[in-house]
Amino acid sequence: ANGTREALFSVVQALAGSEKIPGERSCVLIPNPFYQIYEGAAILAGVEPVFYQIDPATNQPDFSAINPDDLDRCELMYICTPGNPSGQSLPLEELKKLIELAQKHDFVLVSDECYSELYLDESKPCIGLLQACEEMGNFEYRNCLVCHSLSKRSNLPGLRSGFVAGDADLIEKFLMYRTYHGSAMALHHQAARIDAWKD
């Protein structure tokens, strides 16, 4: 993908927009505060953006406060870990609960991990969504996708390089969408990106 922004937008276009429950509008669950692309992607896909709050005291979301009806009609849920603007990461146990929730209610869990390599305590790196899947024995990463970018980790926002990884069935649908929507990368940019991803 040409950066996390494109990936975060495109996954909703590729994977959401149906009536999950006949006669009811589907939704995308979005953290608040949020990256504006989450909301815009949901609106343009024709699904309702529904916000879940980040507790200002803990800088952590309270997923138990999400309306169960919204979970039933949810097609996709965004998480951002480490979060922006708080910098807080979701703990492993919380990620596991979210994966179980995604499988129970059959929605796609999309983790925006563009800040995953930025943390204060170098002895405690952030746990990613796919790592949590593996801890649970979910080696197919069912219902889960992660988005990464060079923008933050390598201070290269103008290079527009990112990737999506996770559930192979979801990636296949994403790639089909991107075949017709995404733009090609210049060869000299590709060479620079390869070097940057290796650092």
Give the residues covered by each predicted segment.
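Conserved core of the PLP fold type I
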Residues: 1-100, 117-118, 122-136
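Short loop/edge segments at beta-strand edges and connector loops
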Residues: 2, 111, 148
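Alpha-helix termination/capping residues and helix-transition junctions
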Residues: 22, 71, 108, 138-141, ...
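A short helix->loop->beta-strand "cap" motif at the edges of active sites that frequently abuts
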Residues: 26, 47, 104-108, 141-142
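Short, Asp-centered acidic motifs that coordinate Mg2+ and/or phosphate
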Residues: 76, 108, 145
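Conserved Walker B
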Residues: 113-115
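PLP-dependent aminotransferase class I/II
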Residues: 143-199
